[in-house]
Amino acid sequence: MSAEIMKKEDNKITLKIVVGADQFEVAINKAYNKMKSSFNIPGFRKGKVPRKLVEQRYGVEVFFEDAMNIVLPDAYEGALQELNIDPIDRPEFDFGEIKKGEDVEFTAEVQVMPEFTVEGYKGIEVEKNEYNVQEEDVQNELNKLTEQNARMIAVEDRPVQDGDMVVIDYKGFVGEDQFEGGTAEKQSLTIGSNQFIPGFEEQLIGASIGDEIKVKVTFPEEYHSEELAGKEATFEVMVHEIKEKELPALDDEFAKDVSEFDTLAELKADLSTKLEESAKKRTEQEYRNNVIEAVANQVELEIPNAVIERQINNMLLDFDYQLKYQGMTLESYYQMTGTKEEDLRGQMREDAEKRAKQQLVLDRISEMEKIEATETDVSEELERMATQYKQELDKLKSNLRDQDYTSIKEGIIVRKTIDLLAENAKVS
């Protein structure tokens, strides 16, 4: 096999690849052995028809396509290695005429990253915002704890107020017709939560237990159900229960109930410490992000569409994982939001292009600075992962695949590269 670059234009390269006649003959024999059981010729048992007889009956080219499929992957990969080419997308092949006993020639057009340089990445000026914890931040955390530990108390002597939880039955109508999905019994709803269609919850304020009321709403134009979008509807609602939130007292007893501390003062001190740690991490992470963005913004680089699409694919996988963690799927998300995959891809595109550029710039800097992931780096990362996932180190290692180790090393290199940039940046 031999290969050469025929043409190079912008970020497209056309390769000429030649597979020797002897090598192709071996592939033809493999194709014949794979297919011979499918030929039925009188006088021969199935799978015993000689190759020459098959070629005489069906033509010498009968095995060419399968033989080409056999030699193509290795020939293409060999050409990439020989010419030191790293494609960013699938190749486009063009096959010429194949003649028996002759070398086989074909071309492969591949996309590669456009050439670009990264300069001035050390000493770049970057803003660093310091986030500090205030007393009101601690109080907000305490308020969240009280909300989480509130009790819902049944109310019978007053009508519905904002913030109450109500238990209702409802039936929805458009005109005289009841619509699908518009009926429920013993449905819990917090007034002011905006869970329902705009205008629905507010009309329940003032209703009492046992009341039957009619709630008139207009579905939003962008509502996920096209049959209901923009239409006026009436809901017949029956109020069964009214409950109000009772917050616990903020005292030492509360601290004992919700934490390992004996006093409210100790709980507040712990919350303050955690908030300070979080603020410090936020300060550092935002600073590192600013450094990456500032360095990448200096680089003139048009990101190929194939790279952007690949980044969008990765972002979609991450989003799908997040949805599954919340008990949803992409399909249910599309239905709920009235969108399609192409809409979501469009929303992600700008961010995907930004991320792709930053990653390419970081990769180039790591090459220039000869940054590597040492055995010590990998060992420390594995120990950190074992602690995070609460696994024994040996068990964690046994579950890791080769590609997992590759990802770990790549992550270490990226982190060390950002460390280098952050340490050498000037805080403005």
UniProtKB/Swiss-Prot annotation:
One of its GO terms (molecular function) is protein folding chaperone. GO terms for cellular component: cytoplasm. Keywords: Cell cycle, Cell division, Chaperone, Cytoplasm, Isomerase, Rotamase. It is an enzyme of class 5 (isomerase). HAMAP family: Trigger_factor_Tig (MF_00303). Involved in protein export. Acts as a chaperone by maintaining the newly synthesized protein in an open conformation. Functions as a peptidyl-prolyl cis-trans isomerase. Consists of 3 domains; the N-terminus binds the ribosome, the middle domain has PPIase activity, while the C-terminus has intrinsic chaperone activity on its own. PANTHER family: TRIGGER FACTOR CHAPERONE AND PEPTIDYL-PROLYL CIS/TRANS ISOMERASE, TRIGGER FACTOR-LIKE PROTEIN TIG, CHLOROPLASTIC. This is Trigger factor. It comes from Alkaliphilus metalliredigens (strain QYMF). The gene is tig.
